[in-house]
């Protein structure tokens, strides 16, 4: 336990400022640490996760029991649960991140001016990253590891629902840092579930360079409204799958069911299915049947409801709802134009997909839909940094500045200019 953890949690401002100071100091050391040391810390952290899998599971069981007692939804409980496979996936994720190319020091561009100045644009760490998240404890491993790989210090504040699980995972990351001879303060976990700690984090501009909030809409809205620190964020994942008139029916069926039902509680889960009227009679009966058999509640417009009595009426609110549950809204549209208009009106700019064998229609969709991730003939559940080959992601950003889409190692760096001269003076 470091000194910050020994401070009384009754003094939240003092506690958080101390954590911030330590993070800033550790970040300066980490920014200069060789890639070999950062990778060694990740590999040692992975080994610690495997060695402590039983202890992590016991702490997770406490959180799961408390979550059920609080009445958390099945979707939130699914996010909270750490099965042996998920613990192993965290360890493998750290190893995958260690295997990624080192982004720090990469020369992005270089040129020489007529006056002889040689200029390079070089990747460098951002500095200190604050991560605020709710019920998904694996974020502790993913976020800590990505920040470490990119040479950033991290301050992790998990939600009260995952408090015990997150602390157990953090202890493994700290063990990895120790084993590699790096400062433990490079990855700190806020040692209190007190919500006042979040309020402090959002004001700590002297110590934190960017904050990544991951959680429900209320958390993101609060952070967006109160933060004085820049953010990487997305408000919600209101994802669409559009089945075009020239979709392959079998492909459309399997992809759409996966996009909705593989894991309903993730932000890449499809929440609205749009079906072209020209293919509705072919695709809707088997699609509605498959979704219902998978346990999905169906809500649809009048045309959709005509195909099955199992479809309840969709309200105007449904088209703007991120369910994060086994519920989906379905609408029949006249054509690609109407699908594009619906997505423009209701998308959260996260991930939207078209299913079609028409290359021109696919290209138009990919060009005109203004979301961070646009897909053709692939499940929206692939909206994930790990699936993009990034090792993992710290979150998905739908913003317009710096990072957009999955925020991986490269997105956790900025750049500076190195200018080399031979005594030039400006006239």
From Swiss-Prot:
BP GO terms, sorted: L-proline biosynthetic process
Top-level EC class as recorded in UniProt: oxidoreductase
Keyword Protein biosynthesis on entry: no
GO CC term, one of those recorded: cytoplasm
Main location class: cytoplasm
A Pfam family: Aldedh
Domain of life: Bacteria
Compartments reported by the entry: Cytoplasm
Membrane-spanning segments: none
GO MF entries: glutamate-5-semialdehyde dehydrogenase activity; NADP binding
Associated pathway: Amino-acid biosynthesis; L-proline biosynthesis; L-glutamate 5-semialdehyde from L-glutamate: step 2/2
Key words of the record: Amino-acid biosynthesis, Cytoplasm, NADP, Oxidoreductase, Proline biosynthesis
Cross-referenced NCBIfam families: PRK00197.1 (NF001221), proA (TIGR00407)
Membership in a protein family: Belongs to the gamma-glutamyl phosphate reductase family.
Free-text function comment from the UniProt entry: Catalyzes the NADPH-dependent reduction of L-glutamate 5-phosphate into L-glutamate 5-semialdehyde and phosphate. The product spontaneously undergoes cyclization to form 1-pyrroline-5-carboxylate.
Protein name as catalogued: Gamma-glutamyl phosphate reductase
Organism of this sequence: Rhodospirillum rubrum (strain ATCC 11170 / ATH 1.1.1 / DSM 467 / LMG 4362 / NCIMB 8255 / S1)
């Amino acid at each position: 336990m470091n000194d910050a953890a020994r401070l009384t949690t009754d003094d939240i401002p003092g506690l958080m400022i101390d954590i911030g100071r330590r993070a800033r100091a550790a970040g300066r050391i980490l920014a200069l640490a060789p890639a070999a040391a950062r990778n060694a810390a990740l590999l040692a952290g992975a080994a610690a996760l495997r060695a402590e899998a039983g202890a992590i599971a016991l702490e997770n069981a406490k959180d799961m029991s408390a979550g059920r007692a609080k009445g958390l939804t099945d979707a939130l409980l699914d996010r909270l649960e750490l099965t042996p496979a998920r613990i192993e996936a965290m360890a493998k994720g750290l190893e995958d991140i260690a295997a990624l190319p080192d982004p720090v020091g990469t020369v992005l561009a270089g040129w020489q001016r007529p006056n002889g100045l040689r200029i390079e644009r070089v990747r460098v760490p951002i500095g200190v990253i604050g991560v605020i998240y709710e019920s998904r404890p694996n974020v502790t491993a993913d976020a800590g590891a990505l920040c470490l790989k990119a040479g950033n210090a991290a301050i992790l504040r998990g939600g009260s629902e995952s408090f015990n699980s997150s602390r157990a995972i953090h202890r493994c990351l700290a063990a990895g840092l120790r084993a590699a001879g790096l400062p433990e303060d490079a990855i700190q976990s806020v040692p209190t579930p007190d919500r006042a700690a979040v309020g402090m984090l959002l004001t700590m501009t002297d110590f934190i360079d960017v904050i990544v909030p991951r959680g429900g809409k209320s958390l993101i809205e609060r952070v967006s409204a109160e933060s004085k620190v820049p953010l990487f964020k997305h408000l919600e994942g209101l994802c669409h799958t559009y089945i075009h008139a020239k979709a392959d029916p079998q492909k459309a069926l399997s992809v759409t069911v996966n996009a909705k039902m593989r894991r309903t509680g993730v932000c890449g889960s499809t929440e609205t299915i749009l079906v072209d009227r020209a293919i509705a009679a072919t695709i809707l009966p088997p699609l509605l049947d498959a979704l219902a058999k998978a346990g999905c509640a169906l809500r649809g417009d009048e045309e959709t409801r005509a195909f099955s009595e199992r479809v309840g009426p969709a309200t105007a609110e449904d088209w703007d709802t991120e369910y994060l549950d086994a519920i989906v809204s379905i609408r029949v549209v006249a054509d690609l134009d109407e699908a594009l208009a619906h997505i423009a009106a209701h998308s959260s700019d996260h991930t939207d997909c078209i299913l079609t064998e028409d290359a021109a229609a696919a290209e138009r969709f990919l060009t005109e839909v203004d979301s961070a991730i646009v897909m053709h003939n692939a499940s929206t559940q692939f909206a994930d940094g790990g699936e993009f080959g990034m090792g993992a992601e710290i979150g998905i950003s739908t913003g317009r500045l710096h990072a957009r889409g999955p925020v991986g190692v490269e997105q956790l760096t900025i750049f500076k200019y190195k200018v080399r001269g031979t005594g030039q003076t400006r006239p």
